[in-house]
From Swiss-Prot:
Protein name stated in the entry: 3-demethoxyubiquinol 3-hydroxylase
Subcellular location: Cell membrane
UniProt xrefs under PANTHER family: 5-DEMETHOXYUBIQUINONE HYDROXYLASE, MITOCHONDRIAL, COENZYME Q10 BIOSYNTHESIS PROTEIN 7
Catalysed reactions, as listed in the record: a 5-methoxy-2-methyl-3-(all-trans-polyprenyl)benzene-1,4-diol + AH2 + O2 = a 3-demethylubiquinol + A + H2O
Cofactor or coenzyme needed: Fe cation
Chain sites annotated for binding Fe cation 1: E64, E94, H97, E178
Cofactor binding, per record: Binds 2 iron ions per subunit.
Enzyme Commission number(s): 1.14.99.60
Positions bound to Fe cation 2: E94, E146, E178, H181
Function: Catalyzes the hydroxylation of 2-nonaprenyl-3-methyl-6-methoxy-1,4-benzoquinol during ubiquinone biosynthesis.
Enzymatic class: oxidoreductase
Length: 215
């Protein structure tokens, strides 16, 4: 039985969330959809271009680690089963992104961020707080998060080497999914967040993207 169709005790929920964290941080994510870059040939990148692609794909991978944590935190505190189901579906699609980014990093010879455990823990707590604020604000948090992520991905598409078609194709697909997640949240009753909260979210994202690019 799926975990969005029954009630779990606090202990059950803690075990499920702990398992999700371990799978995200230490497991090998399995995508339900085919990698959009499959079939594209490996580009001939200079060392500088490869370093640049690795940096951006590492940022994107860490972003997906954060997305998993946020959604799981929100799932744990969602009041409405329909809202919880929406978070569950989005988290599954974000798992595809996680798998695609990790696969591309491995192809490029790069490593994932050494700070992913911190990103996950921090984002999970934020997700819990968002969920505890009520479903409308929690959905508003998703809408604003996805809006900011879409902007980051658009920026990456301007900076990833034009010859790195594999990385670019993955980012393009991710961008479309993020836009749809935001639209789904809005249509499900998202409430707009206060201006200060949006600015704090943008600051948090800036710290993550800056550090994850290098570490």
């Amino acid at each position: 039985m799926s975990n969005n169709s029954r009630h779990y005790s606090a202990i059950d929920e803690a075990i499920l969330q702990g398992q999700a964290m371990l799978e995200t941080l230490f497991g090998k994510p399995v995508a339900q959809r085919e990698n959009p870059a499959k079939g594209l040939s490996q580009p001939a990148l200079t060392s500088a271009e490869k370093k640049q692609s690795i940096g951006f794909m590492r940022v994107n991978h860490s972003g997906e680690v954060c997305a998993q944590a946020l959604y799981h935190g929100q799932m744990a505190t969602a009041k409405n089963p329909a809202v919880r189901a929406l978070f569950t579906t989005a988290a599954k699609e974000e798992t595809d992104h996680l798998a695609w980014c990790q696969e591309r990093l491995e192809e490029l010879g790069g490593h994932t961020s050494y700070l992913n455990a911190f990103w996950y823990t921090n984002s999970f707590l934020i997700g819990l707080l968002a969920g505890l604020s009520g479903d409308p604000l929690s959905l508003g948090f998703v809408e604003e998060t996805e809006k900011q992520v879409e902007i980051h991905l658009a920026d990456h598409l301007r900076k990833i080497p034009s010859s790195d078609l594999k990385s670019r194709k993955i980012v393009e697909y991710m961008q479309q999914d993020e836009i749809q997640h935001g639209l789904n949240a809005r249509s499900s009753g998202a409430k707009e967040l206060p201006y200060l909260v949006k600015k704090l979210m943008a600051f948090h994202a800036k710290v993550m993207t800056t550090l994850a690019y290098w570490i």
